[in-house]
Amino acid sequence: MISSSSCMFFLVFAFFLISPVRSSDVEALLSLKSSIDPSNSIPWRGTDPCNWEGVKKCMKGRVSKLVLENLNLSGSLNGKSLNQLDQLRVLSFKGNSLSGSIPNLSGLVNLKSLYLNDNNFSGEFPESLTSLHRLKTVVLSRNRFSGKIPSSLLRLSRLYTFYVQDNLFSGSIPPLNQATLRFFNVSNNQLSGHIPPTQALNRFNESSFTDNIALCGDQIQNSCNDTTGITSTPSAKPAIPVAKTRSRTKLIGIISGSICGGILILLLTFLLICLLWRRKRSKSKREERRSKRVAESKEAKTAETEEGTSDQKNKRFSWEKESEEGSVGTLVFLGRDITVVRYTMDDLLKASAETLGRGTLGSTYKAVMESGFIITVKRLKDAGFPRMDEFKRHIEILGRLKHPNLVPLRAYFQAKEECLLVYDYFPNGSLFSLIHGSKVSGSGKPLHWTSCLKIAEDLAMGLVYIHQNPGLTHGNLKSSNVLLGPDFESCLTDYGLSDLHDPYSIEDTSAASLFYKAPECRDLRKASTQPADVYSFGVLLLELLTGRTSFKDLVHKYGSDISTWVRAVREEETEVSEELNASEEKLQALLTIATACVAVKPENRPAMREVLKMVKDARAEAALFSFNSSDHSPGRWSDTIQSLPREDHMSI
């Protein structure tokens, strides 16, 4: 009888002769299978490993995507076998019963996405992962990992998703500050200390940090102080008992600290009394309040552009509550939704403010009320509208618009010289930040075609709903006016506000905003139209496909060659060159839609309802293609955002 080792030798030798995949990959796969598949759950048969279950993609004769999910695998990972697969881009063992520690994976130099969630892995965080400089996605949730989360994660400059929830990690959170970081969850561990107030970690709300031992920080509305015993240094170590010979020094230090602390408390109390007196005095003097408004207005003119953000947090709103004649303005809620949280103008005036952006129509703020409730407030630039009744009617029309792909307008405030619009707050950011990150240069990553189709369908449905109202348009469609909802659906904001803009204003429009507009509407004195919205939709679709913002008139520049330009950009920017060949039909469908929308003549553009039908047809064909190819694996970096359902996305 031939031994099992002899069979393995002959099998590997046969693959070396006839397989298009390099023999080392074949040997590595078979060795890996022997360590994690004792029940033979993986039916690897045939002569071409690229057709084996779980081998989702091969590039130039090398395995680049291995996805072995929910196959009842057990045992532990073989580091030697895995490191031989050095061309892997995606590796997933999600939803099995694998155990043990993670071996050294420093040989996977091309790895971009690692999914080890929902297993029984234990041990410390695999330090070798921090040397994989191309790594973007790390998902280790729902295992038994322990120890500290290493600060060496800062070396992963492309880190996009970091999920380690439901483990036993302890210590502090490292000060991650990658501009690319968009998804983060460390909840349900044993972490403690100060959550680092980095720009990257400040994006995430309390749900990313809940159920830990003793975390504190602005993100979870739990301030750090001496009484909690929590220090503000991420690398802080437990206190070491002081020897008896040094007890006197310690006592002197305690006494000195108490005296200094007492003096500091007295100074703070005095300062607080002064501030309260000044605030009371300012309320009684109208001119002092008006001077603050003027100062804020001047500041706005020198601030960043509409995609920029301000770090001037926790400032109080200084808008007026009364008009010059003394008539009190009113905060009016729109609609009759009893589930909407109600608040007063006084609550709004006491809210702390963070500038989210400044645009041609006004400034947008994140307002955090004393109760902790968060809203978005848009302060319109041209506060003195000559026809207030007309303004009120228009806003009430917008307030009646209710659709899953529209950011709801909840309330408005009007006085003679002040107009505010109140929207729901969307913490997941904008489509602009999704594509371009923190860059303002307008150059970002093209999204995968599945993501483009999902976003396009969301936006098309929102626009069709708006266009059902005769004469109503969005009027200012661009990626910064698309927000990501709680389920990462794309939602339109700032819709219908272009009619409120003063057409004779000398305020300049940025180039990026200008070239989203149809040629016939670039003269701001001309009213926006529904065909112009279709044109803007086409430009936005080109931005999704190329990652390039419209700082130039791309349609005029490339004309009939725009499809060639899009393909060239995607071939240059996408890291897997075979993507275009694998999805040519899908890309062509998107290009057909985009080029139809950006027709120079308005009468040649399809109606938004026709555009929606084209997008839905393309998505249906794409879904059929995905089903037939059995490719349900974790996607590229952009797929993890839009193409996955919310429950899958947040639970990986």
Swiss-Prot record:
Pfam families: LRR_1 (PF00560), LRR_4 (PF12799), LRRNT_2 (PF08263), Pkinase (PF00069), TM_ErbB1 (PF21314)
In-chain residues carrying the UniProt-annotated modification Phosphothreonine: T509
Topology in membrane: Single-pass type I membrane protein
Keyword match rRNA-binding: no
Keyword Chloroplast: no
Sequence intervals crossing the membrane: 257-277
GO CC aspect terms: plasma membrane
Family: Belongs to the protein kinase superfamily. Ser/Thr protein kinase family.
Membrane topology, Extracellular segments: 24-256
Location of region: Disordered: 286-321, 630-652
Protein name as it appears in the record: Inactive leucine-rich repeat receptor-like serine/threonine-protein kinase At1g60630
Carbohydrate-modified residues: N72, N104, N120, N185, N205, N225
Subcellular locations according to the entry: Cell membrane
Cytoplasmic topology ranges: 278-652
Modified residues annotated as Phosphoserine in this record: S352, S430, S433
Keywords of the record: ATP-binding, Cell membrane, Glycoprotein, Leucine-rich repeat, Membrane, Nucleotide-binding, Phosphoprotein, Receptor, Repeat, Signal, Transmembrane, Transmembrane helix
Spans of repeat LRR: 64-84, 85-108, 109-132, 134-156, 158-178, 179-203
Annotated positions binding ATP: L356, G357, R358, G359, T360, L361, G362, S363, T364, K378
Residue ranges of domain Protein kinase in the record: 350-624
